[in-house]
A protein has these predicted regions:
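HIT superfamily nucleotide-processing domains
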Residues: 1-110
């Protein structure tokens, strides 16, 4: 475990997209973000900020992607709500324009 508070915790992803990829999860088992309490949302955001500071120091990324997959149609593969905090590095992909919009390639450019 990387970081923890009363309602959430952060750990490195077992299958990282990039060096330093962190997952932020609720302590309580909740399948969907929209079923979390306001306190759990705040607890996860607190850890996102703390993890970002840690990653800035350890990995010095050039940017971040932050996201949640809600439901199978959105790519959720783990039935426990979690944020992905993904460090990004200059040159780590050919064309990062559009960021998370790239999940649907035809919508990446706008």
């Amino acid at each position: 475990m990387l970081l923890e508070n009363a309602l959430a915790y952060a750990r490195y992803d077992d299958h990282p997209v990039s060096p330093g990829h962190v997952l932020i999860l609720t302590q309580r088992h909740v399948a969907d973000y929209f079923d979390t309490t306001l306190a759990e949302k705040h607890a996860m955001l607190e850890l996102i900020e703390a993890a970002r500071l840690l990653l800035n120091w350890e990995y010095a990324p050039d940017g971040y992607n932050l996201g949640i997959n809600c439901g199978a149609a959105a790519g959720q593969s783990m039935p426990h709500v979690h944020y992905h905090l993904i460090p990004r590095y200059q040159g780590d992909m050919e064309n990062p324009r559009g960021g998370v919009r790239g999940v649907i390639p035809d919508r990446q450019k706008y």
